[in-house]
């Protein structure tokens, strides 16, 4: 069966967007690598943004100079860029496999809207557009960091973080109700390459994206307070404590969002929790390396407690997710969309007619009326019907006494 014109248009749009995504992926892979080598057009090494040797938590912002605050050092920044690059490589392989799977599955289209449902299951054009926006913004972020523009880099990374949040939600929910997602998944032919891509490879890619989102939450928190610390007359220690507290608060909203909304679409979404553990390790490294600086500013205990709360809250949220998974497995409740064909059995139960004493002068008229009524009742006897949307109930002839008193 051929797909509808609307589905064909959606598929062609998806293919063109996928080509742009592949090109943007290559560019996002080239930019970080070239930015690490000198004499290739980048003025500075983007990883070395903050010199922790000059870190003083009791100082205030110095005009016309980059005041060092809490940020990623070259090893941590390299780990972050590498993990994001690995996730993008896996996503590249996933979308390439998805395109091959859709080409093979087009031969098994059995409905007018099957192709668009499969495209949405793999990744709609909206998801690809958000992925392209992520790849573009991370390139701009690296280039801006090379020029040491901390204010512009914070703004660019805010756009990148916003695109990452929307992209993660789109990968999990497809911005559709649960029953629509179930209907799209049920339309995929079983034991096919498309089935394997959607139900086995896509959860892995989604969890990798969620893990990267946790790391991006850390970088976003540090970037915001790095820009604030170099824009206003604030103490460096306050900016460090503010960055830690922001990274402590933001994941709580994601934990709540996961249990309220995202868990209905993807139960085993542990990528964000794993990313939070890695981000906590990255955040605690400066506290360990430069312990004397934090101790002299009397911030070591406060920052250490706040940093320790982050993995504790993550562990609690992960335990809640695991308990809810086991609870749903015990209940065995799985909601599926109702079939389009509904069978209704309409049983015929004659209604009791009130007994009245007929008038002698109208016996002949009543007998003729009752005979016609019995014939119409036989014609309108309810039968078992099969309706696609709604069933028409048989008309009943209750009593002719209301017409012929």
UniProtKB/Swiss-Prot annotation:
Signal peptide: none annotated. Residues 39-76, 143-149, 216-245, 289-299 are virion surface. GO terms for cellular component: host cell endosome membrane; host cell Golgi apparatus; host cell nuclear inner membrane; membrane; viral envelope; virion membrane. It comes from the Viruses. Residues 346-405 are annotated as: Disordered. It is a multi-pass membrane protein. It is found in: Virion membrane; Host Golgi apparatus, Host trans-Golgi network; Host endosome membrane; Host nucleus inner membrane. Belongs to the herpesviridae glycoprotein M family. Envelope glycoprotein important for virion assembly and egress. Plays a role in the correct incorporation of gH-gL into virion membrane. Directs the glycoprotein N (gN) to the host trans-Golgi network. This is Envelope glycoprotein M. The gene is gM.
